[in-house]
Amino acid sequence: AASDVYKRQTYAGQLKLRPYQTLHFELGRAVVGQCGSLISKVLYVKQGTRKKFAILDAGMTDLIRPALYQAFHKMENITSEEPLEAYDVVGPICESSDVFGKAIDLNKVKRGDLIALRSAGAYGEIMASGYNCRELPKGYTSDELV
């Protein structure tokens, strides 16, 4: 609309860029974060005395945000339509902080299922590490919306 054009022109006029300058900006986590998911395979399901654990092949080396500052990533079992059950979702690294989430409701999990950790597009790949001799995660891109 005309008001949008006016706002852009006003903003551009206030920047006062010199002819040799260009403006670059980062989209940021609010946009980019939603554009990526970490897909991980379930290695084991372990029944503890009070809770169940879903142990994934991805760990804090692949997505460190939950271990580093308790960031929450929505999780879903993308291969099961069975009823929901609560799981502590953890990685295989021998560190007590290798935890993606506690008491996460997922469709019943079994070995080999695929778990999607959503909103991993920002900082996931760039913060990954080879700690504990682990390979870096593989990245795939698509222009399809799912």
What are these regions (language model features)?
Residues 7-15:
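Alpha-helix-loop-beta-strand connector modules within alpha/beta enzyme cores
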Residues 1-6:
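Short, small-residue-biased leader/transition segments that mark boundaries at the very start
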Residues 21-146:
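Charged (often Lys/Glu-rich) extended helix/loop segments that serve as interaction or gating elements
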Residues 18:
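Acidic/histidine-enriched active-site and ligand-binding environments that engage anionic O-linkages
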